[in-house]
C-alpha cells in the first residue's frame, strides 16, 4: 500500500478523516457529536501513518467541532458516536447549552463583520462622490465686448434686477422619544411558569426568546425559535 501524502491543512485532515471513518466524520452536511476522547482513538488507529502530526490532528478537530454544522448537530436527543459509528451515550444539557452559546456568538460575530464591511463600503462611496463634486469645472471664455455705439445708436436702459428669493427655512420635525425597554427579570420560582408561556433564555451576555414546553424537577424544558428543544436551569431563565 502506498504511503499517504503529507496533509498540510486542517481541511485536508478533515477530508481524510471523513474518508477513513465515514460513520463518524462527514465532509458536508450536519455533523454528528463525537465521542469524548476521540482524539486518542484516532491516534491509535493511524499510529503507523506519517501523513499528519498530533498537533495538526488536534487543530483539525478543534476546527471541526467549532463549525456551525457541528454545533447544529449538538441538540437534544442526539447521540455521541465513536470512529465506527457506534452510539456512546446521549448528550448532556450542559454540552447542548454550551454549543448553543458558541453558535449564537459566532452568528453575532459574522453579523458584526458584515455590518462593518457595509459601513466601510458606504464610506468609500461617499468619499469618491465628494472628490468628484470638488473637481473644478472649466471656465467659459468671457464674451468679447462690442465696439462703442455709433452716434446714431440709442443706448438701451438697464434692466431692473430681480430680488433674490429668500430660501425657506426647513421646519424642524419634533423628535420622538424612544420607548424605554424594561430590563429582563430573572425567574426564581419555576412552578409559576405555564406551558406555552413566552420567556427568555440567557446565553452568555445576551438572551434569546423561548417558549415553555415542560416544567421538570431539574429545570424547564423550552423550545427556541429555531426549533431546538433543551432543558435549562432556573438561573438562566428571564421574563
UniProtKB/Swiss-Prot annotation:
Main location class: cytoplasm
GO biological process: post-transcriptional regulation of gene expression
SMART domains assigned to the protein according to its UniProt record, in alphabetical order: ProQ
Keywords: Chaperone, Cytoplasm, RNA-binding
One cellular component term from this protein's GO annotations in UniProt: cytosol
Basic and acidic residues bias: start-end ranges: 115-137
Cellular location(s): Cytoplasm
Family stated for the protein in its record: Belongs to the ProQ family.
Protein name per its UniProtKB record: RNA chaperone ProQ
Organism, as annotated: Photorhabdus laumondii subsp. laumondii (strain DSM 15139 / CIP 105565 / TT01) (Photorhabdus luminescens subsp. laumondii)
Amino acid at each position: 500500500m502506498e504511503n499517504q501524502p503529507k496533509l498540510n491543512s486542517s481541511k485536508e485532515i478533515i477530508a481524510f478523516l471523513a474518508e477513513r471513518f465515514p460513520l463518524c466524520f462527514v465532509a458536508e452536511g450536519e455533523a454528528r457529536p463525537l465521542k469524548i476522547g476521540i482524539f486518542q482513538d484516532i491516534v491509535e488507529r493511524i499510529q503507523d501513518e506519517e501523513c499528519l502530526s498530533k498537533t495538526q490532528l488536534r487543530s483539525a478537530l478543534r476546527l471541526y467541532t467549532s463549525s456551525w454544522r457541528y454545533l447544529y448537530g449538538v441538540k437534544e436527543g442526539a447521540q455521541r458516536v465513536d470512529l465506527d459509528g457506534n452510539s456512546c451515550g446521549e448528550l448532556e444539557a450542559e454540552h447542548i447549552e454550551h454549543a448553543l452559546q458558541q453558535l449564537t456568538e459566532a452568528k453575532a460575530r459574522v453579523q458584526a463583520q458584515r455590518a462593518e464591511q457595509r459601513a466601510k463600503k458606504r464610506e468609500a462611496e461617499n468619499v469618491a462622490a465628494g472628490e468628484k463634486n470638488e473637481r473644478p469645472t472649466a471656465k467659459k471664455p468671457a464674451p468679447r465686448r462690442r465696439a462703442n455705439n455709433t452716434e446714431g445708436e440709442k443706448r438701451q436702459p438697464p434692466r431692473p434686477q430681480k430680488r433674490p428669493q429668500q430660501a425657506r427655512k426647513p421646519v424642524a420635525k419634533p423628535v420622538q422619544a424612544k420607548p424605554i425597554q424594561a430590563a429582563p427579570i430573572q425567574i426564581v420560582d419555576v412552578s409559576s411558569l405555564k406551558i406555552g408561556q413566552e420567556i427568555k433564555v440567557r446565553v452568555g451576555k445576551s438572551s434569546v426568546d423561548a417558549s415553555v414546553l415542560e416544567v421538570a424537577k431539574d429545570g424547564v424544558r423550552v423550545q427556541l425559535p429555531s426549533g431546538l428543544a433543551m432543558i435549562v436551569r432556573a438561573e438562566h431563565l428571564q421574563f
